[in-house]
Amino acid sequence: MSGLVLGQRDEPAGHRLSQEEILGSTRLVSQGLEALHSEHQAVLQSLSQTIECLQQGGHEEGLVHEKARQLRRSMENIELGLSEAQVMLALANHLSTVESEKQKLRAQVRRLCQENQWLRDELAGTQQRLQRSEQAVAQLEEEKKHLEFLGQLRQYDEDGHAAEEKEGDASKDSLDDLFPNEEEEDPSNGLSRGQGAQHSGYEIPARLRTLHNLVIQYAAQGRYEVAVPLCKQALEDLERTSGRGHPVVATMLNILALVYRGQNKYKEAALLLNDALSIRESTLGRDHPAVAATLNNLAVLYGKRGKYKEAEPLCQRALEIREKVLGTNHPDVAKQLNNLALLCQNQGKYEAVERYYRRALAIYEGQLGPDNPNVARTKNNLASCYLKQGKYAEAETLYKEILTRAHVQEFGSVDDDHKPIWMHAEEREEMSKIRHREGSTPYAEYGGWYKACKVSSPTVNTTLRNLGALYRRQGKLEAAETLEECALRSRKQGTDPISQTKVAELLGEGDSGRTSQEGLGGSVKFEGGEDASVAVEWSGDGSGALQRSGSLGKIRDVLRRSSELLVRKLQGSEPRPSSSNMKRAASLNYLNQPSAAPLQVSRGLSASSMDLSSSS
C-alpha cells in the first residue's frame, strides 16, 4: 500500500493533472489510506496484547510501547489524510454543482439576451407606430379644426341651409356669398347677354354650352370621374382649335375649376382660375365684368383655405370693377360688399365690416325695398359682427327689427292680437318669473305664440337661433326656449310653398312666376355656404319674393331627369318642350339659363358664364 501511495507521487513534475485525474487519484489514495489504517489498527491491537503479556519493567516492554506510539501517530496522520480526501471529494462535488448552476445561468442569460433583443425590436416598432399614430392624430386634429371651421361658417349662414340644426356662437363667419359660381356671377355685370357678347368679341358654341350642362349634372351627382375627363378633353380641343389665349378657353378653365372646387381641390381650382384671369385680362380688359367674377371666385378659394389677407385685395378689386361698370348703387355691388365684409370679419377688422355692411344695407333698402330678403340677411350679418364685438344691445335691436319686419309682412301690423315672436318670448319670460312654480303655461293662454311661429324663412330661423342664444347669455332662459322651439317647429313643417316654387321651376312649371327687371339686371343668386343643401334666389322684379330650393336629393332627382333630355339632344332626337332652366345642387350652386327669354331682358354676361351666355 505504501508503494501505491509512493507510486502516485512519482508522476513527472511537468505533467499537469486534469480535474478528473485528480479526483480519481484522490479516491485511490483514500482507499489506500483506509486499508493502511485498518492494517495499523490490527498491528496496534497485536502490540496491545503483547504489552499485556510482557512483564513490567523489561526492556522489550519499552520497545513495544514505542512502536505503539509510532503506530498511533501514523494512524492520526492517516485519519487526517482521509479527512482531507473526503473534503476534496466533497469540494469537487460542490464545484461540479456550481458549474452546472453556472451553465444553467448562462443559458438563462442567453435567453434573456434574446428576449431583451426581441423587446427592443418590439419597442422600436411600437415607437414607430406611436410616431405614425401621433402624426395621424395631428392630421386628424387639423382636419377636425377645418371641419369645425366649416361648421362654424355654416352656423352664421343666414340662408337656412342644412347646418341650421346647430346652435350656439361660432368663431368664424359663413362665406355664404363668397363662392357664387361663375354662372351666377356673370350676369351680375348688369349688361344683357348680347351686350356681353359684343364686349367679349366672340360667341360661345352651342356644343360647349351643352357640354357644360352635362358637366354640371355629373358634378351635382358626385360623378367627378366622368366630369373631370370631359372638361379636360374639351379644354384640349379648345386649346387646339382656338388657341390657349382665347376667351372660350378661359370659360372652360372656369368650368373645370368649379368641378375641382366641388371636390375640395382648392389649390388646383386656384391655378385654373389664375390662368383664366390672365386670359380674360389680356383679351377682355382689366375692367371687364368677367374679370370681376373671376377675381371674386379666386378670392373665395383663398378664403376657404384661410388666406384672408390674400383674398381681400382680390375682392376689393372686384368691387371696384363692379362699381365702375354697374354703378355704386347696384345690388351686385352690395353683394360684393357683403363678401368683402365677411373677409374682413375673419381678420377682425370690425370697423371696416360695419362700414361695408351698412353700405350694402343702404343699397338693398334703396334699390330693392325694406322687405327684400337681402335686407334681412345683411342685418343678420351685421348683428353677427356686433355679437363678436360684444355689442349685444345693437345686435338684439337688429334681430328684433328682422323679426318684426317678417311679422308685418305676414300679418300686416303689430298690435295686441298680432305680436312678433320676440314679444311673446319676452312676455313668457316675465310670466315665468311670476309663475315659476306652476310649471308650463297652458296652450290657450299663449295661443298667439304658436300663431307667430308661422313666420318662417331661412333668415328668420337663423335670427331666431341667434336671438335665442343672446337671450341665454342674458339669463332669459324662458325667452330663449320659446325662440328655439319656434325655430324647431318651423323646420318640422316640411316642404313649404317657397320650396315647392323652386321645385316647380326646376321641372319647368315656374316660368310664369319669374320676371326680370332690366334696370336691376335680372335675378341674383346667393349661395348658402360651402356645403349648403339649400340656396336662396332673389328675383329682381321688386316683389321681394324669396325662392328657396328643396333638399339636395330632390334637386338631384330633377337633374337626372334633365340629363336624359340633354342626352337625347346630343344623340340628335328632339326633346319635348320644357323650360331650359337647369339648376344645380347647392354644393355646386344653381345654373340658370333662360333660353326662352329675350337677350335684352336677361342678365348681362359676366366673365364666368360666357359659355352659357349665347344661345345656339
From Swiss-Prot:
Residues in coiled coil: 32-150
Compartmental location: Cytoplasm, Cytoskeleton
A molecular function (GO) term: kinesin binding
Swiss-Prot/TrEMBL TPR repeat ranges: 55-88, 208-241, 250-283, 292-325, 334-367, 376-409, 461-494
GO biological process, one term: microtubule-based movement
Biased amino acid composition, Polar residues: 189-198
Biased composition (Basic and acidic residues): 160-175
UniProt xrefs under Pfam families: TPR_10 (PF13374), TPR_12 (PF13424)
PROSITE patterns tied to this protein: KINESIN_LIGHT, TPR, TPR_REGION
Low complexity composition bias: residue spans: 602-616
Annotated family: Belongs to the kinesin light chain family.
Subunit structure: Oligomeric complex composed of two heavy chains and two light chains.
Protein's UniProt name: Kinesin light chain 4
Native source species: Bos taurus
